[in-house]
Every structure is written in C-alpha cells, then in structure tokens.
Amino acid sequence: MESEIFDYFRASNMISKKAIHIPPFIVMDVMEKAAEMERKGENIIHLEVGEPDFDTPACVKEAAIKAFRDGKTHYTHSLGLIELREAICEHYFEKYNVKISPDQVLVTSGSSPAMLLLFSALLNPGDEIILPNPSYSCYSKLIEFVDGKPVWVGVSEEDGFQYLPEKIVEKITKRTKGIIFNSPSNPTGNILSAERMREIAGLGPLIISDEIYHGLVYKDREHTILEFTDMAFVFNGFSKLYAMTGWRLGYTIVPDEFIRPLQKIHQNFFISANAFVQWAGIAALKETKEEVAKMKEIYNERRKFMISRLREIGFGITVEPTGAFYVLANAGKFSGDSYRLAFDILENAKVGVTPGIDFGSNGEGYIRFSYANSLENISEAMDRIADYLEI
C-alpha cells in the first residue's frame, strides 16, 4: 500500500498538465546555454536577448535609494502609487495628447504580470485572441495558460511584416475577445502606421496594444492605440526605454469597467508592485529625457551598422526595421531550420542569437538579432558569424 501511495505521489503524477505542456521560452534557453559556456571559459557575445546594455540612469537609482532610506518599503495601493499613476497619465498626455485617469492604471512587477492579469480577466475557456505570426513568444503561451485560444494572422516579409486589417477580419468569430499587436514590434522591429492602427481599432473586438518599445523609434513616430479608441488595453513598462529590465516595473491602462476585475486578481496574485521601485519609476518618467535621447542615438547607430553587416554576410532584410532594437533577418541562404542554426552559431561562432521559430511558425527560416549591445561587440559578432558561415 505504501509503495502504491509513493508511486502515485511521484513528481510525474503531481505536475499539472499546464506546467508539462507549456512550451519553453527559447531565447532563455539560448541565453542559459550561453551562460553555461561562459562558465567553462568561452567568450560569448550576446545578441539573443532584448536587454539594454546601458546602465539604469543615475537619477532613477538615486530615487530608489532615497525611497529605500526613507522607509518606503511597505505595501502600496494594489493599483500602484497614485504619484506614479498620475505620472503615467501625464506622460501619455504630453506624448500622445490622450487623457486617461489614474484610476485606469494598474502598476505591476513588469509588463508580463499585466498580460497574465488581463488574459485572466478577459478570457473564458475557448475564447480567442487574434495575434500576429510572428510575434512575442509569450503572448500565445499566456493565452493558452488561462485556457484561451490564440488565433494567428500571418505577417510576411513581402508585406514588410505589416499586420493587415483585411487579414485580421477574416479571423474574427463570436469567440473573439481581442486583437493584440506590438508596435514597435518584437521580433520584426516594424511600426504600424496611424492609418493601419485606426483601421484595426475599428474592427470591433477589444484591442490590446503592447507599447513596451515606445520611445525606441528611429524614423517616423509611434502611436498609442488610445489615440484611436477608448476600448483598448495598453501594456507598457520601464525595462526597455529606461534600461530597467532587472527592476521589474510595468503597468497596464484599461477601460474603466475592467479595472476592478484586474485589481481583484492582482490583489490575490501579487498584492502590489515593489514600493521603492515605483518611486524610481516616477524619476524615470520625469528626469531621464537626456539619457534616453542619448541611448536612442546610440541604438540607431548600431541598427544601421548591423543591417549593413548582415546584408554583407548574406542574410535577407527586405524592409529595414525602424523600432525596438531587433533585426529579424531571413536566414534561408544558410538553413531552413532556425533552431538548429541558432544553436550552431552559438556553439561554433560563440554568438547568441534567437531562432525565428520562437516567435511562431512564420518566424521559421529567420534569425532575430538584438543590437542592445556595444558597437564593438556587434562588429566582433558579425565577424565571427561571417567566419563560421564562410563568407
């Protein structure tokens, strides 16, 4: 009897089906493999992860230290500090001329929890979210984790990786709860035009706009979905623009009627975001204009250099990315298996890159390169890849 009980309680029987079946985040597998190689003495250049190589601006660190020393280390309101929520509203008004209330803002420990909260509040089993293929890997996994259904709309290199309203409308059903997009996009670096965003906003279902790369645009300008509709959800945060990935601070902006359901889930799952980090977020919004402009200038220099070198090596780039800090390059000349190619490049050229398959089936045959690294390291990485591919 004891043996039967022991067998039943083996880990293989106790782990939930959701935990068993959730796919890995491949870019993290690449990064962790690279870290393992580094521990063995290998010199790896990281172009796989979307993490700024810049240090967090000094004023942000100073604000966090001051808050910490002032004893601001306790729970905050579950929606977040009112001072931070007001600063977020001011930011959206100054940049986009849209008016939102602090009562529509929920501050979270990074934008990923905001996604989990929204999908948990929005989706019943079998409800659908339409999303571009390729797109950020975790969207579909979070949707499926709460028993929703991701419905893919293919975007292609031939169309400049644009999310086309005429293709989206074909996927709308009675179960469609929302349409999600990310502009500037991860992994493509493309930007949706105001006209296209307006068309998508008019399609009917709720719109979910991931605006985490706003501010990192090198031509034209980005738009918030809130310029075109009030019935939209926004994800945003501090990781990318302000070089604060390790701080874990994000937020979501939602229509009035949705804030209480999200707040209740947040209270139960997370209670509140870190208090002194929220004070640092206020400084990021109000005091980093010069630092952000300098980082953006450097990113743009790297962007142009990387595009040029990748083309020389033989990677295809039909439309130049003009936002975020990624280049999604066609690797068809070298391999149709992006997963194998990415790990071959890591093993042989000692450069971390992300396989396009991590972002959906339409990403297969592509490699995503991040230029969130120094120009010197990017140059060395391009040389290593060219040598490995015998260019």
Regions found by a protein language model. Give the residues of each.
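Short helix-loop boundary/capping segments at the starts of domains
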Residues: 36-39, 43, 66-74, 94
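PLP-dependent class I/II
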Residues: 2-15, 21-25, 30, 37-43, ...
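Glycine-rich phosphate-binding segment of PLP-dependent enzymes
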Residues: 56-76, 89
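A general structural signal for alpha-helical elements within enzymatic catalytic domains
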Residues: 35, 69, 89, 93, ...
